[in-house]
Amino acid sequence: MKALTLTLAATFASIAIVGLTAAQSIPSLEKKPLELGNFSVSLAVKDIKASKAFYENLGFKEVAGKLEQRWIVLQNGNARIGLFQGMFEKNIMTFNPGWTTDKQTLPDFQDVRELQHILKQRGIKFTTEADESTKGPASFLIADPDGNTLLFDQHVPSPKR
């Protein structure tokens, strides 16, 4: 039994080493890092006033939005969340290319259309797409394998590259 266990362990180790070597030699797996920009979580809430009070008790401060329009953005250090009442059904992870955590425009960044192009090449399926013939603000949506929505939402002019 011990010999069988050792043989199986050696076989799996060989498979893992061969798989790793093969994967490293495939150019499509060598991925350029993406500059996704500022990250926040957009929460679909039922009662924006109750949600705002809850997050303020956690130390978050309102930094943007309009409560009367049922959306606000709260921040605590580098953590940023958006509260949205009646605007979408599920929570969304949001990336803002070109923005710092305090909504300052970066001098150089990957435009949302460049990110979209790279993700298409990697086989990512899109829920909505940015118009690649335009410049400036644009957005697209994708979903991860579990159905979580990711929004890539550029609010600033395209960088001059």
Predicted regions and their residues:
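Core segments of cupin and vicinal oxygen chelate
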Residues: 35, 42-87
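N-terminal beta-strand motif that seeds the catalytic metal site of vicinal oxygen chelate
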Residues: 12, 17-49, 155-161
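Short hydrophobic/aromatic beta-strand element in the GNAT-like acyltransferase core
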Residues: 71, 80, 92, 139-141
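Bacterial N-terminal signal peptides that target proteins for export
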Residues: 1-9
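Short beta->alpha transition motifs characteristic of CBS
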Residues: 65, 84-87, 132-134, 152-159
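Vicinal oxygen chelate
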Residues: 46-49, 87-88, 95-149
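Structural preference for beta-strand elements that scaffold enzyme active sites
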Residues: 40, 92-94
